[in-house]
């Protein structure tokens, strides 16, 4: 049932099992020298711990990990868990809030996400690249501060504080990049 993949055939985006851990390949390089087996260096992300490491593999046969993406909608937070509703079966999926420290900054009621699962094990939540969030509080603009792109601090509805342009006011909706948490633009 499980598929085997050779280390030299790994590509970015592939998932595999190595030393009882689930990995996602971020980058890889293959070096082959005369009369030696090829050496594969992979920058990988551990899907259980989210840590990023470099693994050196030499001619190993690895088990491919099949990761399922389940469309879900954020429902509510309960103590130390975030509760999502599966978009197809309508069952509730609970995820430990400590697993989603960064992702929590972009999740509000009704947010649509993809939940990454390996079998029945919930690994993580995949967010869209950009989300629309409400500005909860924005500092007042400073007049004459226009030598370069003038920025000020703003607190979003999730509690995340980011730098925004001077013209953004409290109560506006803005688009934020979920990868780096930076302001992208106004939401229309």
UniProtKB/Swiss-Prot annotation:
GO molecular function: translation elongation factor activity
Gene3D superfamilies in alphabetical order: 2.30.30.30, Nucleic acid-binding proteins (2.40.50.140)
InterPro entries associated with the record: Elong-fact-P_C, NA-bd_OB-fold, Rib_uL2_dom2, Transl_elong_fac_P/YeiP, Transl_elong_KOW-like, Transl_elong_P/YeiP_cen, Transl_elong_P/YeiP_CS, Transl_elongation_fac_P
Recorded superkingdom: Bacteria
A GO BP annotation: peptide biosynthetic process
Pfam family, one: EFP_N
GO cellular component, one term: cytoplasm
Keywords for the protein's UniProt record, in alphabetical order: Cytoplasm, Elongation factor, Protein biosynthesis
PANTHER family per UniProt: ELONGATION FACTOR P, ELONGATION FACTOR P (EF-P) FAMILY PROTEIN
Biological role: Involved in peptide bond synthesis. Stimulates efficient translation and peptide-bond synthesis on native or reconstituted 70S ribosomes in vitro. Probably functions indirectly by altering the affinity of the ribosome for aminoacyl-tRNA, thus increasing their reactivity as acceptors for peptidyl transferase.
Family: Belongs to the elongation factor P family.
Name of the protein: Elongation factor P
Species of provenance: Malacoplasma penetrans (strain HF-2) (Mycoplasma penetrans)
């Amino acid at each position: 049932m499980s598929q085997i993949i050779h280390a030299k055939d790994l590509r970015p985006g592939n998932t595999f099992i190595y030393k009882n851990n689930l990995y996602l390949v971020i980058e890889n390089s293959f070096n082959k020298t005369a009369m030696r087996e090829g050496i594969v260096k992979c920058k990988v992300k551990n899907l259980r711990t989210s840590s990023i490491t470099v693994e050196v593999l030499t001619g190993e046969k690895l088990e491919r990990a099949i990761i399922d993406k389940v469309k879900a909608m954020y429902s509510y937070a309960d103590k130390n868990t975030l509760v999502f509703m599966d978009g197809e079966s309508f069952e509730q999926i609970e995820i430990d809030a400590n697993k989603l420290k960064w992702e929590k900054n972009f999740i509000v009621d009704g947010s649509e996400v993809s939940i990454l699962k390996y079998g029945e094990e919930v690994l993580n939540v995949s967010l869209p690249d950009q989300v629309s969030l409400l500005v909860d509080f924005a500092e007042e603009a400073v007049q004459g501060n226009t030598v370069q792109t003038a920025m000020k601090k703003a607190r979003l509805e999730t509690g995340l504080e980011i730098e925004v342009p001077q013209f953004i006011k409290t109560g506006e909706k803005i688009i934020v990049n979920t990868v780096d948490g930076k302001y992208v633009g106004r939401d229309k």
